[in-house]
């Protein structure tokens, strides 16, 4: 997770424009689910916030939040916006409902936080390298293009869906299994995942810490 307070201090010192992409933080981090920016108390200080509706919101599309004049500039000069279609009514309604649920049902955020800590503990017990993630996305390192795909296949065949991430999405030798946790995952499902990982970690040479 970024040291946003330090980044903000540098930007303020040098009068730099600060854009925060909080795709993995919104709906998950912060007292009210406003993301990493709320966690650091900087909601009214960053220049622009961008993110996606495809994660915590459970739909499609994305957003950019900034002062009116900046958004107007993007509307007329951003290639991504100029050559993109407007969101459908059902997409907009879905995103609005997700925002309401983030406000009204904090228990899901709390349950996800518990699952994140539980998954961390399980991976550490197995001695697996998952980087220094603080979000619901866990990159279990494999560091081999063939092995990461085979490990993902074995997991899928046993009912666990993960994304094998390899070159060119990441540099060579940095391939990983990308686990995405939700509040709906049960402890039994997470324990099953640990059991499979324990069985395959030597054969597919999952990276150890």
Where are these regions (language model features)?
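Helix C-cap/helix->beta junction micro-motif
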Residues: 13-14, 126, 158, 204
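Active-site C-terminal subdomain of aminotransferase-like
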Residues: 14-17, 24, 29-134
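Conserved PLP-binding catalytic core of the aspartate aminotransferase-like
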Residues: 110-119, 124-159, 169, 174, ...
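PLP-dependent enzyme catalytic core of the Aspartate aminotransferase-like
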Residues: 157-160, 169-209
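Active-site core of PLP-dependent enzymes with the aminotransferase class I/II
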Residues: 1-15, 147-148, 188
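Cytosolic Rossmann-like ligand/nucleotide-binding regulatory domains
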Residues: 165-166
């Amino acid at each position: 997770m970024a040291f946003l307070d330090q980044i903000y201090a540098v930007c303020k010192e040098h009068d730099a424009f600060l854009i925060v992409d909080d795709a993995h933080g919104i709906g998950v981090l912060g007292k009210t689910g406003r993301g990493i920016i709320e966690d650091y108390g900087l909601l009214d200080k960053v220049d622009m916030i961008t993110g996606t509706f495809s994660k915590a919101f459970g739909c499609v599309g994305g957003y950019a939040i900034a002062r009116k004049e900046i958004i107007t500039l993007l509307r007329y000069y951003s290639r991504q916006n100029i050559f993109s279609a407007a969101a459908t009514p059902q997409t907009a309604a879905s995103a609005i409902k997700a925002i309401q649920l983030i406000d009204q049902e904090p228990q899901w955020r709390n349950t996800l936080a518990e699952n994140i800590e539980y998954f961390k503990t399980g991976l550490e017990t197995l001695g697996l390298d998952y980087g220094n993630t603080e979000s619901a996305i866990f990159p279990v390192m494999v560091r081999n293009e063939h092995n990461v795909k085979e490990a993902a296949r074995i997991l899928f065949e046993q009912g666990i869906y993960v994304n094998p991430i390899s070159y060119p999405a990441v540099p060579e030798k940095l391939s990983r299994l990308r686990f995405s946790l939700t509040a709906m995952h049960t402890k039994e499902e997470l324990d099953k995942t640990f059991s499979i990982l324990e069985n395959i970690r030597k054969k597919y040479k999952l990276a150890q810490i």
